[in-house]
Amino acid sequence: MNHWIRNWIITDRNPSSNANRMNFQVSSLRQEPKGLLKKEVYEYKAPWPVYGLDWSKLPGEKAFRLAVGSFIEEYSNKLEIISLAEPSTYDDDSYYHRSNIDFVKIAEADHHYPITKVLWEPYKGGSKTSDLLATTGDYLKLWEIVSDEANNGIFNRRQQLITKQTLKNKKVDFKAPLTSFDWNQLDSSLAVTSSIDTTCTVWNVETGQAKTQLIAHDKEVYDVAFFTNEVDTFASVGADGSVRLFDLRSLEHSTILYETPPPQPSKTGSSSNSSNQQSPLLRLSFNKISPYYIATFHMNSTEVIILDIRAPGLPVAELNGHNAPVNCVNWSPNSSNILCSGGDDCNAIVWDLGDLSTPNSTISKYNQDPLLAYRATSEVNQLSWNTKYPEWGKLMVTTSYDTAMYGCTAKYDKSIDLWTFLIKLYNHNRD
């Protein structure tokens, strides 16, 4: 992760002057849906550094849209919606192909503070027509995409991105920057935010009211996520080096799932580095299929830690594939065993951790080796899986099947690339 981004999220310092070098990139594992994707890499050059990133959750052509958030030091940040250029008509004779344009901007709005996270509203099927998304920075903000009546129904025409609501805790005078948030998949009226003031706040986004605020950690909270398919349970990580689990039905207590181990003593008997005692944990991700598993990582660490909340205390796996600090982790939305991580070594690594869908599953040493890696042109700071387009988001992890996996990654040089791979997964003899 770029140091100036990490510093802003962690300490609220001013970013460095290297902001104009950041890149944004989109990633996927290659299969051509209905002949749609013709190239290995699709690129979008953002006009500013990018950190916030999320695929649309709606099905159909709208699944090709990305929400993109800038991260610059002035109060002049932007939220942008881009889309793959004319996906239904992308052929060798199209205007976009001849002009070498892969993505087009369809909406943009001002967002004063840097965007620490952006998410589209969870989709539950049906004929819902609202197009909502949310961001964090100074506040939790809800946005709506409004189509121009003259262009209604025309794909990729310019639309309006308007602020629907700004959620503020009226009981708090000081506005502490928000480091992250999550939107509940079962009850889309619920969202939870994390802040550098050590708190997490649960919101009702329909009423705009804070349901509860709690002191979650001893120091800054850097990330928060709902337990998959639960409305009352969420976990957080922070500067105190711990992963904590909370239940909204019993907030008097929390469960510490993991704490940074103390530093190993040197030969002289003293600790080698006392600062390691509270090495911050920066991000976490719940497994979307087998929710007992959490992926997280320490600041300035090359290792991804896998935890099982049924067995707190020690990691069930430690994934070592990066050669520079890890910046992001995200489980596949369609396969319990697939995880992707990105780092300062310019790699987005895909891991196959074996069958985690059954109770008491274990991760063998065999599964702690990378399955494959995408080599980017600069540091990978963020990633997101595409979930809704039928041939894009579905992972068919079965014997000898061609498997398409699609996601997106944010880089350090202002570009967005859609990258594709075609892989085959075989049954292996696992010890």
Model-derived regions: residue spans:
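Beta-propeller domains
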Residues: 2-8, 12, 20-44, 58-108, ...
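Asp-box/WD-like beta-propeller blade repeats and closely related beta-sheet repeat scaffolds
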Residues: 147-185
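Short loop/turn segments that connect beta-strands within beta-propeller blades
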Residues: 85, 146-148, 205-208, 248-251, ...
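WD40/WD-repeat beta-propeller blade N-cap
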Residues: 44-50, 108-115, 162-178, 215-221, ...
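Short coil/turn segments within WD40 beta-propeller repeats
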Residues: 73-80, 138-141, 179, 197-201, ...
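Conserved beta-strand element within WD40/beta-propeller blades
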Residues: 66-72, 132-136, 191-195, 234-238, ...
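WD40/WD-repeat beta-propeller blade-loop signature
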Residues: 49, 62, 114, 177, ...
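Loop/turn segments within WD40 beta-propeller blades
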Residues: 55-63, 119-129, 182-188, 225-232, ...
